[in-house]
A protein has these predicted regions:
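RAMP-family (Cas7-like) RNA-binding scaffold and associated basic/acidic loop-rich RNA-contact surfaces
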Residues: 17-206
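N-terminal ordered "arm"
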Residues: 2-19
């Protein structure tokens, strides 16, 4: 059911006004911070700190992926752009926000100009004017159930309508870089189990 819903959301990206389609990502704080940086007087460090404070006020935890940042620094091969990107805070789970909520969050941070945004305002920013796909499929926020949105669409799992017996698929693969005459057999041989059936799928809209 999740893969079906994702396919519908991807379809929306090309067939529905982009302002009506939300983003579902751990990197939502980064997207907001980059919009804040478009305003004069806001560098990356200041924007990152302000976004973290906004989410903290709303009761949503954020963190910098310190292991990824350390790995990039230790590699000695990371570009400055990659290092900068790794310093943005992320949520601990995929967060679903509409374009309006993202823009409004950035505007609120700029208007506050370093002042703390109150809890009620922060929660209102992240919980009004939802996107079309959010209204359809709902939203769950682990940190605060008040942000949850009931879905208007229920998508069932695809179910096989008859008994199916597992079959074994035998496969071989050739090594593209093997020298001629170096190896006479296959680069890989194996079997995988597979099943096939006629599927029954349905969705209901409230």
């Amino acid at each position: 059911s999740q893969s079906w819903k994702r396919a519908i959301r991807k379809y929306f990206e090309t067939h529905v006004d982009s302002e009506s389609v939300g983003d579902r990502s751990k990197r939502i704080p980064e997207k907001i911070a980059r919009k804040v940086q478009d305003h004069e007087g806001w560098d990356a460090e200041r924007a990152q700190a302000a976004v973290s404070e906004l989410f903290k006020s709303a009761g949503i935890k954020t963190e910098v992926d310190s292991r990824k940042l350390k790995a990039l620094k230790d590699s000695g091969e990371a570009t400055q752009e990659e290092l900068n990107a790794a310093q943005y805070p992320q949520t601990k789970y995929l967060l679903f926000l509409s374009p309006h909520q993202i823009v409004r969050a950035a505007e609120a941070i700029v208007e506050a100009d370093g002042e703390k945004i109150k809890k009620k305002e922060a929660q209102e920013i992240l919980d009004t004017q939802h996107s079309v796909d959010m209204a359809l499929f709902g939203r769950m926020v682990a940190d605060d159930a008040a942000f949850n949105i009931d879905a208007s669409v229920q998508v069932a799992h695809a179910l096989g309508i008859h008994a199916s017996a597992p079959e074994f698929d035998y496969f071989t693969a050739v090594d593209d870089l093997a020298e001629e005459g170096e190896e006479t057999g296959a680069g890989m041989i194996g079997t995988v189990q597979m099943m096939s059936s006629t599927l029954y799928r349905y969705a209901t809209v409230n």
